[in-house]
Amino acid sequence: MMRIAVIGAGAIGGFYGARLAASGQDVVFIARGATLSALTTNGLRVTGTEDLTLAVQATDDPTEVGPVDVVLMCTKTFQVADAAASYLPALVGPDTLVVTTQNGLQAPFVLADAIGREHVGPGLCRVWTKIAEPGVIDLMGGPQSLVVGTWDNSITPTLTAFRQALRDAGVDTVDTGDIWTALWTKVIHVVPEGAVGALLDAPLGELLGRHLAIFRRCIQEAVAVGRAHGADFPGDIVDQTLAFLSSQDPASTTSFQRDITAGRPSELEAQMGALPGLGDEVGVDTPVCDVIAETLRVRAERDAAA
C-alpha cells in the first residue's frame, strides 16, 4: 500500500484520488473551504459515466499527514508555486515523488525550483472531468490515463510502485522512457484545442469541422516548437493528433476554454501564452499562435477590469 497525498480535490485530483482510494491505497486529500467541508461531511463522489461514492481522508493541514510516497499536484498551473510552498515541506521525504498533472510544460519546472528535480515526476493526464459541485466530480467519458516519469527518465522504486498502483486502480498508464516527448504529445493537442476553442467559442466537433484549417495550423506550429525542443514525434503526428481528437466527444471543451469563457483566472500564460516564447527560444515562428495568444490575453485583461 502506498501513502498518497492529493493536493486539490477538483476535477483531476478528485477523480484520480477516488480511483486510488477505492483500490485500497492510503490516500489523503489536501483541500480547503467548501471542498474540504464536502469531503469531510459527504465523502467524495464520481458521477457521469460511472458512479462511485466513498468516505475519504481530508485535511487542510499537511503536518497532520507527514511525508508520503507520492504527492499528486492537481492545482491549476498558476497555483503550483504557492501550493508547493504551503504544503510540500511537510509532505516530501527522501524518496517522495511529486507528480504533476497540469497541462503545458511549466509545472515540472516550478516544482523543480521548489523541491529539486529528483523529487519531480512529470506527468500527463487524459481524462474528461469537471466539478459538478464541491466533492462531486462528473466523469464525461474519454480516456482515463495518467502517464508518469522522472526528470531524467530514470526508473525508481517509487515510480515503479506508483505505476502499478495506477493499474490496480483501473487507470491506464504507459511505462514511457521519454516523459518529455509524452508531455509534448499532449501539449500539441490540448493547448490548441483549448485556445482555438476559447477564441471561437466552439466545442471540439466544430474545431474539427468548420474551423479545421486554423486548428490544424495551430497544431502544426506547436509540433514545430516541440520538435525543436527535442520531442521525438513521428512524421505523421499532426494526422495522428487529429485522428485521436476525432474519436472524442464532439461536444467536449477543455477546462482552460471554460475558464476563459466564464471570465475566470486561467492557465493562458502556461498554455497558449507560453508557446510563442518557447518558439522564440529555438528560432521557430508561431504566427497563428501569436495572434491567438494575444487576442485571448486582451480578452482576459478586459474581463478582469470589468
Regions found by a protein language model. Give the residues of each.
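NAD(P)-dependent Rossmann-like dehydrogenase/reductase catalytic/cofactor-binding core
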Residues: 216-306
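A structural signal for isolated positions on well-ordered beta-strands in alpha/beta enzyme cores
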Residues: 5, 28, 97-99, 147
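Rossmann-like NAD(P)(H) cofactor-binding subdomain of soluble oxidoreductases
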Residues: 51-136
